[in-house]
A protein has these predicted regions:
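NAD(P)+-binding Rossmann beta1-loop-alpha1 motif at the extreme N-terminus of oxidoreductases
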Residues: 1-50
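Flavin (primarily FAD) cofactor-binding/catalytic cores of flavoenzymes
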Residues: 21, 30, 84-85, 176
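Short internal beta-strands
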Residues: 28-30, 166, 294
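Internal alpha-helical scaffold of NAD(P)-dependent oxidoreductase catalytic cores
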Residues: 37, 90, 131-204, 210, ...
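Rossmann-like NAD(P)(H) cofactor-binding subdomain of soluble oxidoreductases
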Residues: 52-55, 60-151
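Helix-loop-beta segment of a Rossmann-like dinucleotide-binding subdomain
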Residues: 58, 91, 105-117, 156-168, ...
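NAD(P)-dependent Rossmann-like dehydrogenase/reductase catalytic/cofactor-binding core
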Residues: 224, 236-295
Length: 295
């Protein structure tokens, strides 16, 4: 299977390494120092103090890589407009696009019922360019439950967690999503197929939409955030509002904020992805994590 990783950061590099190890023909869209490192050393993964390298094709021009069977979209939300302008050469009639990103995606309300069914979210796709370039029919949604970081350009580190949740936006258990799940399981990932991937996205967002921005504003790791009673109380109140929003649009969350806090506590002194972006001087995913919920 021909697989292109669009975005060779922590999550994209981790997924791409597993797929390449399983025998897929993996290519990567990258640029700058990351592209240079991939061409020199291959795609490197560090876990359990061992570094492995997988040979991959790489380019900053998608047209160089040709039509793919699967594109794993693992960029940060602010990069999506550029992706929409450049991704077409990777897409054939049957190409699947697996989104492996944080926050609310542009297709979130396109595949299931509820009060806002079919609504375009202007906070994440203001001009409709994402929906045009990547219509919902191409999409398989993904939720990643793993901690990874970038050691250096072209090398990622897997810390813990190995779960990928997949789902059609419509909730159907189609042949293609079952085949994709089997491929990812063969590649060493723990995979579940969801009947409502929007709920899984919303549940992960339930924690990210509060802890990530607070970490970015304060520079605090998750342990410090969870140990501050006033901050934790503020987070809980925001989460209750988000829980109510989810229930109104058809994606209820059964848990209470404190249940989610217990999961966050297990991360220890962890730097959120948004804090890592602040430290690296990168654009922040505020629209996908915060503005979309407000909208």
């Amino acid at each position: 299977m021909k697989v292109c990783i669009y975005g060779a950061g922590a999550i994209g590099g981790w997924i791409g390494s597993g797929l390449a190890h399983a025998g897929c023909s993996v290519s990567v869209v990258a640029r700058g120092a990351t592209l240079d490192a991939l061409q020199l050393h291959g795609l490197r993964l560090r876990q359990e103090n061992q570094v492995t390298s997988q040979a991959v094709a790489s380019s900053d021009t998608p047209a160089d890589l040709g039509v793919q069977d699967l594109v794993v979209l693992a960029v940060k939300a602010p990069s999506l407009p550029d992706v929409a302008r450049q991704i077409a050469p990777l897409l054939g009639p049957q190409t699947i696009v697996l989104t492996a990103m944080n926050g609310v995606p542009w297709w979130f309300l396109q595949g299931f019922g509820g009060a806002l069914a079919g609504t375009r979210l202007t906070s994440v796709d203001p001009e409709g360019t994402l929906a045009e370039a990547l219509p919902v029919q191409r999409i398989v949604g993904g939720v990643v439950h793993a901690s990874c970081s970038v050691d250096e350009p072209g090398q990622v580190c897997h810390h813990f967690g190995n779960k990928l949740i997949l789902g059609e936006p419509s909730g159907e258990k189609t042949g293609r999503v079952q085949q994709l799940a089997a491929l990812l399981e063969k590649s060493g990932f723990e995979v579940a197929v969801s009947e409502q991937i929007q709920k899984d996205i919303w549940y992960k967002l339930w924690g990210n939409m509060t802890v990530n921005p607070i970490s970015a504003l304060t520079g605090a790791t998750t342990d410090l955030i969870m140990n501050d009673e006033l901050v934790r109380g503020f987070i809980s109140r925001v989460m209750l509002e988000a829980k109510d929003i989810g229930a109104r649009i058809g994606i209820p969350i059964d848990q209470q904020p404190e249940d989610r806090h217990q999961i966050t506590r297990k991360l220890g002194a962890f730097k959120t992805s948004m804090l890592q972006d602040v430290e690296a001087g990168k654009a922040l995913e505020l629209d996908a994590l915060v503005a979309a919920v407000r909208e």
